[in-house]
């Protein structure tokens, strides 16, 4: 959209972040009037965010790079309730101790993408427990309850989904929408925050906050959502057959993170380069045109750039070198994922199919047998019989390298 005047909206539109905006023209005007504050909320349901939340982090990064102040809202209060959005069943209730542990783990990733401090555009991290814990229930209902209608809330997709499936939606979860709306008003009062961003599934919750700000404080607030991404094959972003693709390196190694992006489907390379890297659009356009084997070079660039942002330059370079050694030279790099097996078991010999299952390269004995029979499973880069006993004599530099297909490698070490 060439008519957009603000750098932020122009960038997020050109790169594919934009899904909906409450008032694009008015927001564009506000963003040309100087530094503004925007926030995105993150509930603390695990000790790390995964790739599914990376687009939101990139939105905050672009917000800061274009001269504005990003606010990271940690949901220390709302996580106690659980966001029903996108869920067809109630979330598991978490204790305060678990929430605190999760929050500590999640916080670390933001320092890699944002600059925190006391400056005008420096990022700020806040916890909604700081104000939600102090709310008096009767006062909250009296002051804000009349601004929300059950009629409207029943139209939200997250509510309709539960009701249509005749699945319980607790009053506890129903209150989540009120509290998220109140968060926006509180951040406006404390930090003059005018914009809430989030995934498209949060549209209803964001609208609640925009409308509550207008009714309670006569404030002009805005909402902007990004699309919920799937891969070209329909898979959810951040999910693989082996589980979530975590952003914290204590949950997933930089090598495995790099591999996830290296294995991007051809049709997704250009889109992911726009969303998850800061490469110029003309360079991305060049990479998008690559075909055949050349597209693999674009995938390596994607993997390098995303890993660099998330784990640092050194980790990205090391992951790329591990890939080169593993795939181009056949060397079993020590940076490959590792599984430890008791030395006594390995000395006695473990059938290859059983070892593949224990290493997580196959979900069942049957799957492992088929993999090995078809030649897709290898031990130290050699095809073996499914019942071949893998033992101490197979150790190479203290490890046995298992391979499933062309891209999955595990080192088995005796302990």
From Swiss-Prot:
What is the source species? Paramagnetospirillum magneticum (strain ATCC 700264 / AMB-1) (Magnetospirillum magneticum)
One MF annotation (Gene Ontology) recorded for this entry: RNA binding
User: According to its UniProt record, which protein family does this protein belong to?
Assistant: Belongs to the class-I aminoacyl-tRNA synthetase family. TyrS type 1 subfamily.
Write down the PROSITE patterns for this protein, in alphabetical order: S4 (PS50889)
According to UniProt, the reaction catalysed is: tRNA(Tyr) + L-tyrosine + ATP = L-tyrosyl-tRNA(Tyr) + AMP + diphosphate + H(+)
Q: Which Gene3D superfamilies match?
A: HUPs, RNA-binding S4 domain, Tyrosyl-Transfer RNA Synthetase
By what name is this protein known?
Tyrosine--tRNA ligase
List, for all copies, the residue spans of the domain called S4 RNA-binding. Answer: 350-415
Q: How does it assemble?
A: Homodimer.
Summarize where L-tyrosine binds, as residue positions: 39, 176, 180
Q: What does this protein do?
A: Catalyzes the attachment of tyrosine to tRNA(Tyr) in a two-step reaction: tyrosine is first activated by ATP to form Tyr-AMP and then transferred to the acceptor end of tRNA(Tyr).
As for subcellular location, the record says: Cytoplasm
Q: What's an example GO cellular component term for this entry? A: cytosol
Predominant localisation class: cytoplasm
Q: Which HAMAP family match?
A: Tyr_tRNA_synth_type1
Report the residue ranges where the short sequence motif 'HIGH' region is annotated in this entry.
44-53
One GO process term, biological-process aspect: tyrosyl-tRNA aminoacylation
What are the UniProt keywords, alphabetically? Answer: Aminoacyl-tRNA synthetase, ATP-binding, Cytoplasm, Ligase, Nucleotide-binding, Protein biosynthesis, RNA-binding
Claim: Lipid metabolism is one of the keywords in the record:
no
Q: Which residues bind ATP?
A: 239
The listed location of motif 'KMSKS' region is 236-240
* SUPFAM superfamilies named in the record: Alpha-L RNA-binding motif (SSF55174), Nucleotidylyl transferase (SSF52374)
What does the record give as EC number? 6.1.1.1
């Amino acid at each position: 959209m060439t008519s957009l005047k603000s750098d932020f909206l122009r960038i997020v539109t050109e790169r594919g972040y934009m899904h909906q905006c409450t008032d694009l023209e008015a927001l564009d005007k506000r963003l040309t009037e100087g530094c503004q504050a925007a926030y995105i909320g993150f509930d603390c349901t695990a000790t790390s965010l995964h790739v599914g939340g990376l687009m939101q982090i990139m939105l905050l990064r672009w917000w800061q790079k274009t001269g504005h102040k990003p606010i990271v809202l940690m949901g220390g209060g709302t996580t106690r309730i659980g966001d029903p959005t996108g869920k067809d069943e109630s979330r598991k209730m978490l204790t305060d101790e678990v929430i605190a542990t999760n929050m500590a783990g999640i916080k670390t990733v933001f320092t890699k993408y944002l600059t925190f401090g006391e400056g005008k555009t420096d990022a700020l991290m806040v916890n909604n427990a700081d104000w939600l814990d102090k709310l008096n229930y009767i006062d909250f209902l009296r002051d804000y309850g009349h601004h929300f209608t059950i009629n409207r809330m029943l139209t939200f997709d997250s509510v309709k989904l539960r009701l249509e499936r005749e699945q319980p939606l607790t009053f506890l979860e129903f209150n989540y929408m009120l509290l998220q709306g109140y968060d926006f008003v509180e951040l406006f009062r404390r930090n003059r925050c005018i914009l809430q961003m989030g995934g498209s599934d949060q549209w209803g919750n964001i609208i609640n906050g925009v409308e509550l700000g207008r009714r309670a404080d006569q404030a002009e607030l805005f909402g902007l959502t990004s699309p919920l991404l799937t891969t070209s094959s329909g898979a959810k972003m951040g999910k693989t057959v082996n589980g979530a693709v975590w952003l914290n390196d204590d949950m997933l190694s930089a090598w495995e993170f790099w591999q996830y992006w290296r294995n991007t489907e051809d049709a997704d390379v250009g889109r992911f380069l726009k969303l998850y890297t800061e490469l110029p659009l003309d360079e991305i356009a060049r990479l998008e045109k690559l075909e055949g084997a050349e597209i693999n070079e674009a995938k390596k660039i994607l993997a390098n750039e995303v890993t660099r942002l998330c784990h640092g330059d050194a980790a990205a370079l090391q992951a790329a070198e591990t890939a080169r050694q593993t795939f181009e030279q056949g060397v079993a790099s020590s940076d490959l994922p590792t599984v430890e097996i008791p030395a006594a078991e390995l000395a006695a010999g473990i059938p290859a199919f059983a070892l593949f299952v224990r290493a997580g390269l196959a979900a069942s004995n049957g799957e492992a047998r088929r993999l090995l029979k078809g030649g897709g499973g290898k031990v130290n880069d050699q095809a073996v019989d499914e019942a071949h006993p893998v033992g101490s004599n197979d150790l190479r530099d203290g490890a046995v390298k298992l391979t499933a297909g062309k891209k999955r490698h595990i080192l088995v070490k005796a302990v």
